[in-house]
Each structure stands twice: as structure tokens, then as C-alpha cells.
């Protein structure tokens, strides 16, 4: 299935690329999420008339993500209190949603989908370097400190 990308998609292409993808990936992910349209002669012609508009929108999204990364830098370390035992083990865990909520509470909007935890949830008190994928091209590292909280 050939599609025209309407925005940059990681490991696939950039705005305007005509790429061949598996039918399921195209129908179930790219088309419903608005990241691509099917490549027909009419859609290619329509895309060429909208190309500048789409590229400007993509550049604006990237600039916005870079701005959010600078704001997150200004926050410094994010501290999250969690109920923990004497040895530093948490009763429960700190996940992507908790980290996103803590950053949002500090003043910068971050969704849980933007928080990348490749090794799973955090289960011990300590300092962690967490990747935030704010845009396809913008990855930012934030320091998260988990402390034992007597009130949690």
C-alpha cells in the first residue's frame, strides 16, 4: 500500500514522501491518526498544493517541542514523593503517568505517551535520567528524583 506522509514518521520518512507500507500499518495506524493519505494521482496533486502549509505546520510543531524542552530544562530535577519501605523499595511504582503529571504540575504540559521508560516502571528511591520524546526530532532528558514520602 502506497501512502503520502503528511508529517514526519520515525524510521519511515518525512513530509511528502511516498512510501510503501504494509496494508495493516497504513489502514490501522497511519491513515486514522492523520499521518498519511493513500497515494492516488488525485491525492498526490492535492498534496502538492498543500505542501507548503503542511511543512509550515510540521516546523511549528518542532519549534513548540524545542520550546517545551527549554522550559523543562529550566525546571531542573523533578521530585516525586512515593511511599517506600526502609530499604528504598517503593510500595507500588512510579510510571510514565506519574512522571508526566509531576512535570505538568511543575508548569510544562507533557503527556504520558511522551515519557519513555524502556526498562519499565521505577520501583526504588533514587535519581533517574528519563527520556522525553517531545517530537520525532526532539528528545530531551530530564532528571527525576524519587524520594520516600511519609504522607504518600
Swiss-Prot record:
Gene3D superfamilies (UniProt xref): Ribosomal protein L9, C-terminal domain (3.10.430.100), Ribosomal protein L9, N-terminal domain (3.40.5.10)
GO cellular component terms listed in the entry, alphabetical order: ribonucleoprotein complex; ribosome
Alphabetical GO biological process terms: translation
Alphabetically ordered keywords of this record: Ribonucleoprotein, Ribosomal protein, RNA-binding, rRNA-binding
Gene Ontology molecular-function annotations: rRNA binding; structural constituent of ribosome
InterPro entries documented for this protein: Ribosomal_bL9, Ribosomal_bL9/RNase_H1_N, Ribosomal_bL9_bac/chp, Ribosomal_bL9_C, Ribosomal_bL9_C_sf, Ribosomal_bL9_N, Ribosomal_bL9_N_sf
Function of the molecule: Binds to the 23S rRNA.
Family: Belongs to the bacterial ribosomal protein bL9 family.
HAMAP family, sorted: Ribosomal_bL9
Record-given protein name: Large ribosomal subunit protein bL9
Organism: Saccharophagus degradans (strain 2-40 / ATCC 43961 / DSM 17024)
Name of the coding gene: rplI
Amino acid at each position: 500500500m502506497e501512502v503520502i506522509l503528511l508529517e514526519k514518521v520515525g524510521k519511515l520518512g518525512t513530509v511528502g514522501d511516498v512510501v510503501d507500507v504494509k496494508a495493516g500499518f497504513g489502514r490501522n495506524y497511519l491513515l486514522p491518526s492523520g499521518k498519511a493519505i493513500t497515494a492516488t494521482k488525485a491525492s498526490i496533486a492535492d498534496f502538492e498544493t498543500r505542501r507548503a502549509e503542511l511543512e509550515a505546520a510540521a516546523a511549528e510543531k518542532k519549534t513548540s517541542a524545542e520550546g517545551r524542552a527549554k522550559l523543562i530544562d529550566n525546571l531542573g530535577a523533578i521530585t516525586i514523593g512515593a511511599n517506600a519501605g526502609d530499604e528504598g523499595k517503593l510500595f507500588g511504582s512510579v510510571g510514565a503517568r506519574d512522571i508526566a503529571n509531576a512535570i505538568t504540575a511543575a508548569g510544562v504540559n507533557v503527556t504520558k505517551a511522551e515519557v519513555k521508560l524502556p526498562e519499565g516502571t521505577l520501583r526504588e528511591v533514587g535519581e533517574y535520567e528519563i527520556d522525553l520524546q517531545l517530537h520525532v526530532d526532539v528528545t530531551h532528558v530530564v532528571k527525576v528524583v524519587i524520594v520516600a514520602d511519609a504522607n504518600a
